[in-house]
């Protein structure tokens, strides 16, 4: 498997005039995602969420289990990607499984945004901004460096930051990042430089600067590293603009996406007429890179939001190319030397190692297009051969740099896949991110909500009866004998609220019930060693 630098150096002839181009938003197959709150989280999914919450709660500067094989935050498993995909996983859980309990995930999500602003996450850009002949063949001299990580290029960071902030605002109704200076980058090394550098943004100014750059680069998107526009990295700012439009009642995405579509149609489309998935465009050379790397599974998963019919049309072909069945019946990423030989016709030795998060990208893509059979086989491989580990109740897969075991089975595990992407794939539903894109919340769901839970794991929380009732599932934490404590918010003071144990159908039966006292702020708290799994909170008077 070529690494990203290999893709940049490889190049390919431009493929103008090919393909049907990009489908407009809202076209394609009908959305197939289940109704929010229909599906409860299971033990494994809940453990993934616990791990993400554990990492989000780490002190600033503590990057436990997040160390990358690359020392400069330049590779595909850098902190920025781990933080972003952990946040997106929380977002998927909030939207699809816990729509009546989003507040329970707001703190970890916000903490991930805070970590995204730390210097060790984005300071690589000061050196990267100089470019070089590996990124820009024929470059005569390095550019003057700049520190601001979002003012120009670097969409591989700024696009994810914008998507995180926009998703946070849409899901939790918190406008804190609309405040001037709420997204501030501080660069103040102790031993060098001419003093502190500060670059202040907020949600609105960050989005505005990114949209301006789309126009500056002829509507094809914004470069990641200098001179290279990667298709996948530009999908996340498009998502972000969609989320903000939903909340603000604006329509900024439609003209932006229309221009993006026209620009790429003129070059054959991001999925061209030969069904090649475009990886990147070298700007100055106007060269398209379409090497069929399994890393493009990430691109397909992201494009499913607004061109699902095209993505599904090519997914079967790429699943056969990128995935390989093992003797045990699991699926792994096809070994890099086999992929290279298939793509180029040039055999290479089996020593070519795995070095990208391709397994995680494939899991993300399969979860989004709803290929449950292949996804299950891929996850089964991870569970059998990639050391699933539980720590403080959280499930993750620790980093392993060794490519294969003695039997040739893939054992390579990067921290992006192990901390975030397999969690994302498990918690996602078919068309999961597409559902957020097509049906973003214009406001937080109204009515009562669950705001905190201790002593138990919340598996599902959904509004019923027009938002006036909560139905939720709890499972007591096996490792503790502490009572279950549940905090509620947005309860109407003066009304009588009743909590009832229900059957699996959600209807009150022979289960116990109790009246819940509500304070003047519309909040309530219960503490009980209750043992049932499903409950219903409703106003009865």
Functional labels for PLM-detected ranges:
Residues 6-25:
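N-terminal export signals
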Residues 26-67, 92, 139-142, 165-175, ...:
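Terminal, non-catalytic domain-edge segments
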Residues 29-128:
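Extreme N-terminal leader/anchor segments
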Residues 45-49, 53, 87, 102-121, ...:
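Hydrophobic core segments within long, regular secondary-structure runs in both alpha-
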Residues 74-88, 149-163, 228-236, 290-298, ...:
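Aromatic- and histidine-enriched alpha-helix N-cap/loop-to-helix transition segments
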Residues 97-228, 274-276:
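Extended ligand-binding groove/face enriched in aromatic
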Residues 183, 190-205, 209, 213-357:
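Extended ligand-binding clefts on enzyme/binding-domain cores
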Residues 501-523:
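Solvent-exposed beta-strand/loop surfaces of large extracellular or lumenal domains
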């Amino acid at each position: 498997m070529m690494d990203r630098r290999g893709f940049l150096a490889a190049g390919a002839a431009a493929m103008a005039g090919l393909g049907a181009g990009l489908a407009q938003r809202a076209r394609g197959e009908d959305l197939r995602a289940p109704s929010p709150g229909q599906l409860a989280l299971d033990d494994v999914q809940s453990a993934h969420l616990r791990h993400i919450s554990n990492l989000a709660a780490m002190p600033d500067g503590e990057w436990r289990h997040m160390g990358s094989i690359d020392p400069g935050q330049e590779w595909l498993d850098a902190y920025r990607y781990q933080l972003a995909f952990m946040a997106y996983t929380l977002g998927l859980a909030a939207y699809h499984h816990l729509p009546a309990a989003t507040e329970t995930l707001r703190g970890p999500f916000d903490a991930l945004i805070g970590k995204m602003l730390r210097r060790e996450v984005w300071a690589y850009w000061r050196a990267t901004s100089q470019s070089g002949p590996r990124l820009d063949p024929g470059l005569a001299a390095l550019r003057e460096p700049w520190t601001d990580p979002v003012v120009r290029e670097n969409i591989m960071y700024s696009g994810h930051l914008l998507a995180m902030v926009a998703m946070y605002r849409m899901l939790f109704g918190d406008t804190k990042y609309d405040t001037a200076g709420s997204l501030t980058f501080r660069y103040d090394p102790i031993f060098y430089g001419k003093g502190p550098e500060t670059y202040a943004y907020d949600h609105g100014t960050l989005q505005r600067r990114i949209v301006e750059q789309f126009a500056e680069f002829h509507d094809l998107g914004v470069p990641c590293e200098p001179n290279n526009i990667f298709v996948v990295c530009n999908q996340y700012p498009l998502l972000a603009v969609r989320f903000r439009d939903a909340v603000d009642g604006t329509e900024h995405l439609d003209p932006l996406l229309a221009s993006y579509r026209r620009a790429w149609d003129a070059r054959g489309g991001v999925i061209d007429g030969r069904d090649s998935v475009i990886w990147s465009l070298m700007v100055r050379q106007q060269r398209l890179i379409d090497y069929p790397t399994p890393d493009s599974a990430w691109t397909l998963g992201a494009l499913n939001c607004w061109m699902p019919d095209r993505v599904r049309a090519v997914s079967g072909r790429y699943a056969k190319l990128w995935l390989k069945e093992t003797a045990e019946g699991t699926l792994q990423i096809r070994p890099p030397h086999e992929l290279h030989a298939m793509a180029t016709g040039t055999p290479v030795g089996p020593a070519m190692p795995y070095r990208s998060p391709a397994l995680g990208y494939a899991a993300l893509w399969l979860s989004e297009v709803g290929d449950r059979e292949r996804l299950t086989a891929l996850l089964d491989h991870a569970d059998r051969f990639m050391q699933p580990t539980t720590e403080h109740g959280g499930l993750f897969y620790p980093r392993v740099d060794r490519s294969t075991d003695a039997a040739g089975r893939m054992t390579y595990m990067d921290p992006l896949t192990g901390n975030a992407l397999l969690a994302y794939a498990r918690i996602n539903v078919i068309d999961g991110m597409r559902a957020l894109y097509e049906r973003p919340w214009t406001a937080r769901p109204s009515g009562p909500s669950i705001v905190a839970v201790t002593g138990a794991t919340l598996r599902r929380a959904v509004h019923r009866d027009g938002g006036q009732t909560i139905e939720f599932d709890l499972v007591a934490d096996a490792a503790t004998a502490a009572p279950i404590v549940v905090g509620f918010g947005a309860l109407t003071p003066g009304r009588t609220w009743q909590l009832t144990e229900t059957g699996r159908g959600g209807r009150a039966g022979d289960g116990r019930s109790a009246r819940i006292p509500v304070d003047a702020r519309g909040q309530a708290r219960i503490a009980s060693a209750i043992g049932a799994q499903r409950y219903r909170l409703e106003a009865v008077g």
